Amino acid sequence: AGTNDVAENTNPYNEDYTLGNIVSMVELAKVNKIKVILTSVLPAAAFKWRMEIKDAPQKIQALNTRIKAYAEANKIPFVDYYQAMVSADNKALNSRYTKDGVHPTGEGYDVMEPLIKAAIEKAL
């Protein structure tokens, strides 16, 4: 749930539906005694395969705000990949970390890895 939802890869985007899917995954994990860590959705200014979507940055930021609020309200660790990976204009995935504007490169994953490792270590 996240980038693919905003890109409307399967259905028209609905923020409530996407957040609901995330909440459902969290609840399913908790019922099965799986520790949960939530992360922000990575930034994306546009989707080359869906150029008609013009407001991706705003949708991603709004969804991230809700994911973070849900995590805080439910005492779930939250990793903010967005801030670590966003461009200077606060809209796109930093070009240092992507070739297509959506998917991280190895260098991008190098930025993300210590963030999630720290959250995992803290959660254990």
Predicted segments, located by residue:
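Oxyanion-hole/transition-state-stabilizing segment in secreted/luminal serine hydrolases
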Residues: A1-L19, L42-K48
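Surface-exposed amphipathic alpha-helices with a cationic face
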Residues: V23-K30
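Structural beta-sheet core signal
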Residues: L38-T39
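Catalytic His-Asp segment of secreted/periplasmic serine-dependent ester chemistry enzymes
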Residues: P43-L124
